[in-house]
Design a protein with these regions (language model features):
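Acidic, polar-rich low-complexity tracts and alpha-helical solenoid repeat scaffolds
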Residues: 1-133
Length: 133
């Protein structure tokens, strides 16, 4: 039942309720549901500016739930956002390009990765054009 609460809260943009439901789910879930709960743990940590703890969760997904490619791919996008938040745009760009190249079967993931990549490249172009000699 917790997964239904969590997913409906995400769909209705009730992130506080979703965060709570996914935290409860994380304690009891196995397999793909555990990967999903961990993804949202990383997602919420990223939104709170907790970039390094978020990356630790993404690494756990990669290590323990590598068979669940969809949440693995989505969590890599969170990792890229974390690296951008940590001022490492090179690493962020590399991860996003890798997601776009390697997860073509997930069109929603590709679109999200491309959108994030375009944003980062746009921000970097602004930053670089403001540098004067």
């Amino acid at each position: 039942a917790q997964i239904i609460v969590a997913r409906s809260a995400i769909k209705t943009n009730d992130e506080a309720k979703a965060k709570e439901a996914y935290a409860k789910l994380q304690k009891i879930a196995k397999g793909e549901l555990a990967a999903e709960a961990l993804y949202y743990d990383a997602y919420f940590k990223n939104k709170e500016g907790k970039f390094e703890p978020s990356n630790v969760v993404v690494q756990k997904i990669a290590k323990d739930y590598s068979g669940y490619k969809y949440f693995g791919a989505k969590s890599l996008i969170v990792m890229a956002k974390n690296f951008y938040g940590l001022k490492d745009s090179f690493q962020a760009t590399y991860i996003l390009e890798s997601v776009i190249e390697n997860f073509k079967e997930y069109t929603d993931v590709i679109e999200e990765a491309q959108k994030e990549l375009d944003f980062i490249k746009g921000e970097e172009a602004k930053r670089n054009s403001s540098i004067t000699n």
